[in-house]
Curated annotation (Swiss-Prot):
SUPFAM superfamilies tied to this protein: S-adenosyl-L-methionine-dependent methyltransferases (SSF53335)
UniProt key word S-adenosyl-L-methionine: yes
Catalytic activity: prephenate + S-adenosyl-L-methionine = carboxy-S-adenosyl-L-methionine + 3-phenylpyruvate + H2O
Domain of life: Bacteria
GO biological process: tRNA wobble uridine modification
Binding residues for S-adenosyl-L-methionine: 39, 64-66, 89-90, 117-118, 132, 199
Species this chain originates from: Klebsiella pneumoniae (strain 342)
Protein name per the record: Carboxy-S-adenosyl-L-methionine synthase
Coiled-coil segments on the chain, per record: none
Amino acid sequence: MSHRDTLFSAPIASLGDWTFDERVAEVFPDMIQRSVPGYSNIISMIGMLAERFVQPNTQVYDLGCSLGAATLSVRRNISHPGCRIIAIDNSPAMVERCRRHIDAYKAPTPVEVIEGDIRDVAIENASLVILNFTIQFLEPGDRQAILNKVYQGLNPGGALVLSEKFSFEDAHVGELLFNMHHDFKRANGYSELEISQKRSMLENVMLTDSVETHKARLRQAGFEHAELWFQCFNFGSLVAVKSGEQA
């Protein structure tokens, strides 16, 4: 059961850095819907992308799965024999709740939920890999290596979905979209105190990149085809396809 996010509604004397702990996991569905513009669209359309890219007898990876929203969207939209979804997150609280969510919805495609570091997970025989608002929480020096590993583990014709909060090389545009995002949160009931305190906790943990930086990394990893397919304010998603024919 999801609860309304009121974690930052009262002043917090010592904020510290952001962690995906039990308190965050409990309110996460409400938090992300009210904080990330276009989130529901991205989740539903990941299912549509899965219909197009997932192949029989292959694996789907949801790297940084949180509560499993993307995994569930994929599973609702595929019915190929021999497919398996592997969902990974390093937060024990998220993994525990993710397993409950997955178990609550019965479907023929098996899902394995793993508590672990995505940097340590092997990607093999993949037709679809999802990095949904995950890269931004990794150390910048680790980001290229993850994308390299994803590319190597994808089968020809397979796809990566990479969703992120973006920074912008044009400072004027960046400020406009930053302010519109805050307007979005205000419209969803967050107070100035809540917005400010959450931002303070995230600023040393969530380090954003520009769309151009993401595309450059994808090219370096080997992807010949990569483009932004969805954007709302300073949030969006790219799809990158590995060249070659699907088996």
